[in-house]
């Protein structure tokens, strides 16, 4: 009898594949929109924290109404620095305000997809987006991929560049470091290829080091056979 595939084991939800979210700092979301729609909140950065679940550090901010929130830290933020959230916030690094209020050519990050959703786009370490143009019913923003995306003018964004840039510039060099990078988020690593396995472990396995059968497989194949190009319309390089 064959062995279970990795995706079959993952589907059981054991601790081997479960994210260690109990170690994460917590959710990073903007202050609810109804609290800052008509006013601007002032806060002070209490501390800057490392978050194992993110590629960027987070900052804990205490606001004047007594609430504390985690925000994605921008480059250059300092402990004790004042930040503002609201439509009348000044144009300065770390401040959050609607895209309609941000001038063209400004670097922003943590952009809301829908007004009030708390921030969805451009949150990874070292990333930033660029406000390209503002119109009456939309704001055009260039994302890190180069894509130009239109946002609702009431979507909020934070001014600046996400901290933690340059983390990919230092080479990993040895497998032991890659192991600990994966372990921090409980990633299944290393992940062997099917053709490198024995025939008992994978449909593509065996000593011949080639699949030995078509790599395409039916959408209705049983779980232990459903590997390769699933219900593929075409395979191979486009010519």
Swiss-Prot record:
Disulfide links within the chain: none
Compositional bias of kind Basic residues: 222-239
InterPro entries per the UniProt record, alphabetical: NA-bd_OB-fold, Rib_uL2_dom2, Ribosomal_uL2, Ribosomal_uL2_arc_euk, Ribosomal_uL2_C, Ribosomal_uL2_dom3, Ribosomal_uL2_RNA-bd_dom, Translation_prot_SH3-like_sf
A GO BP entry: cytoplasmic translation
GO cellular component: cytosolic large ribosomal subunit
Summary of subunit composition and partner proteins: Part of the 50S ribosomal subunit. Forms a bridge to the 30S subunit in the 70S ribosome.
Role, per record: One of the primary rRNA binding proteins. Required for association of the 30S and 50S subunits to form the 70S ribosome, for tRNA binding and peptide bond formation. It has been suggested to have peptidyltransferase activity; this is somewhat controversial. Makes several contacts with the 16S rRNA in the 70S ribosome.
Family note: Belongs to the universal ribosomal protein uL2 family.
HAMAP family membership: Ribosomal_uL2_A
UniProt-recorded name of the protein: Large ribosomal subunit protein uL2
């Amino acid at each position: 009898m064959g062995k279970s595939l990795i995706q079959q084991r993952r589907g059981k939800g054991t601790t081997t594949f479960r994210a260690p979210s109990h170690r994460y700092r917590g959710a990073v979301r903007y202050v609810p929109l109804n609290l800052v729609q008509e006013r601007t909140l002032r806060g002070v950065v209490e501390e800057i924290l490392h978050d194992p679940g993110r590629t960027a550090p987070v900052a804990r901010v205490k606001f004047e109404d007594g609430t504390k929130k985690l925000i994605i830290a921008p480059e250059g933020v300092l402990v004790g620095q004042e930040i503002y959230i609201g439509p009348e916030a000044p144009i300065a690094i770390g401040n959050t305000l609607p895209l309609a209020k941000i001038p063209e050519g400004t670097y922003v990050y943590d952009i809301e997809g829908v007004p009030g959703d708390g921030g969805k786009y451009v949150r990874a370490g070292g990333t930033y987006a660029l406000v390209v143009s503002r119109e009456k019913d939309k704001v055009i923003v260039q994302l890190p991929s180069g894509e130009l995306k239109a946002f609702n003018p009431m979507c909020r964004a934070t001014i600046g560049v996400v901290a933690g840039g340059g983390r990919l510039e230092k080479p990993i060099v040895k497998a032991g470091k890659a192991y600990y990078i994966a372990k921090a988020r409980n990633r299944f690593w290393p992940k062997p290829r099917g053709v490198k396995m024995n025939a008992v472990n994978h449909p593509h396995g065996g000593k011949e080091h080639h699949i030995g059968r078509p790599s395409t497989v039916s959408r209705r194949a049983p779980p232990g056979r459903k590997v390769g190009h699933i219900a593929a319309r075409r395979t191979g390089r486009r010519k």
